[in-house]
Amino acid sequence: LDKRVCVRNKNRLMHFNGEEFEFYTNVIDSLIIDMEYFPVARSKTRKTWVEYEDSWGNERTYGGKRTHEGCDIMSEENKRGVMPVIAASGGTVTNLGWLELGGWRIGITSDNGIYYYYAHLASYADNIKCGDRVKAGQFIGYMGNTGYGDEGTSGKFPVHLHFGIYIKDGIGESSINPFYLLKKLEKCR
């Protein structure tokens, strides 16, 4: 890419929507800096071990009509507690525990303020707690099928990791589609 063309196009876009363009440019830059690893560790014995598709924005009905705010990374084995989940980005554990929709979940906020959400876990890494610092690539738990009910509910859907990314956008919190970032990180497992 010719750097002059990129700068010229960036300046042209800023003219039409300067503040918003600058905000989202910073978000994209932060995501590129933050995300170092695919959130499911690579299998040593199999070429493929997970499957996923762009399901962000699809309709969900449990708990009322809503849109899907992440990407479901499915375990090909469909066995809970087998597939290790790792931190895609370093940061601080800011949420840990049960959510009716997400089951056992971990939320990690990066130093750039981006929130990474890992849901439906079977279990957590030993001794992990809110306030802990984690490094990108660090083991944080195992893929499961928890959620959609009272604390401890499991088995209502296949084993998978729901991976979500959220930003604070001045109005509140917005979900970002992680699919294309995950595609880019497939080799970094």
Descriptions of predicted regions:
Residues 79, 130, 135-138, 142, ...:
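Acidic, glycine-rich catalytic/binding loops that coordinate metals and/or anionic ligands
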Residues 86-130, 152-160:
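Zn2+-dependent peptidoglycan hydrolase active-site motif and core
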Residues 50-54, 63, 118-121, 172-185:
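Short amphipathic beta-strand/extended segments with alternating polar/hydrophobic composition
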Residues 75, 95, 120-123, 145, ...:
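A residue-level detector for short acidic-glycine micro-motifs
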Residues 65-78, 107-114, 165-176:
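Small beta-barrel nucleic-acid-binding modules, principally OB-folds
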Residues 105-108, 135-151:
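Short hydrophobic beta/alpha edge segments that flank linear recognition/processing sites
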Residues 2-104, 136, 149, 187:
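Surface-exposed, glycine-biased beta-strand/turn segments
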Residues 114, 125, 142, 147, ...:
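Feature marks short, surface-exposed loop/turn motifs that line or immediately flank catalytic pockets
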